[in-house]
Amino acid sequence: MNYNELKDFAHHAQAMISSGAVEDRLRHYLSSKLPSIFPDSPWWIQAHMEGTEAHVRFSTGQRNREGFVDAVVGKTAIEYEKNLTQQVIFDEGYHQVKEYCAALHNIGIPAEEILGILSDTVRWYGYSITIVGDVEDGHLYGPDNIELTQTAVVDLSQETDEEFRRFEVFVSQFLDREQSRLLNASTLVTDFGMDSSFYSQNISVFRDTIIRAMSEKPDYAALIQQVWQNF
């Protein structure tokens, strides 16, 4: 992590918050700065961008409803607000974290693997969840079924080395954690598809291996080629 870039981001983001910037401006500013703060390009930065405004489903009262979460990174739901020093805004964001964590549980993710984040891009609150109560047949889990336990807090507005280190740990715990990625087609394409770093780094080896195998066993290669052409 580049601490100088993080410090620069924290200073400017706090100035934006103090001047009354809306949530979207803060969120877009964060997204634009993440690649310079994390120059090693961890997987979750791309996931953070692609998971923006993800479609989710959960219940409110006795009704199932649909919504859009600010960001989903693997099994972590993120809610951004414009200024978490204002209690009314914090409370609204806290409730939405519960909604979005319920939505992750509704798609089959075990509660112990779900984490939630509430942030204004400068202050970061991290939560684990517990499922409480039961749901009736045909109904989804909702915020009333989610109990949040705060497990980490970071305040980058302090602009201290200690808080910057805490943020690095926070990111590792909530965004870059092991086994947090969903195993689906989108993830596989991101990791191994034609636009991935894996592809660009290894395609020449694969190509040479295939060409050599085809030249050594042309009859077998012709059979395989025919099978794929008729697939």
Predicted segments with their positions:
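Acidic-basic catalytic patches of nuclease active cores, encompassing PD-(D/E)XK
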Residues: N4-H55
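Conserved aromatic-histidine-acidic binding/catalytic patches
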Residues: Q14, S18, V22, L26, ...
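Alpha-helical scaffold elements adjacent to nucleotide-binding pockets in ATP/GTP-utilizing enzyme cores
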Residues: R25, Y29-K33, E92-Y100, R166, ...
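Conserved short hydrophobic interaction patches
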Residues: K33, I37, Y100-A103, I107
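Active-site metal-binding core of divalent-cation-utilizing nuclease and nuclease-like domains
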Residues: P42-G74
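Charged, often flexible domain-edge or linker segments that flank or initiate folded functional domains
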Residues: R63, G74-I89, A102-F231
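Well-ordered mid-protein domain cores that form the structural environment of catalytic cofactors
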Residues: F68-A71, Y80, Y94-Y100
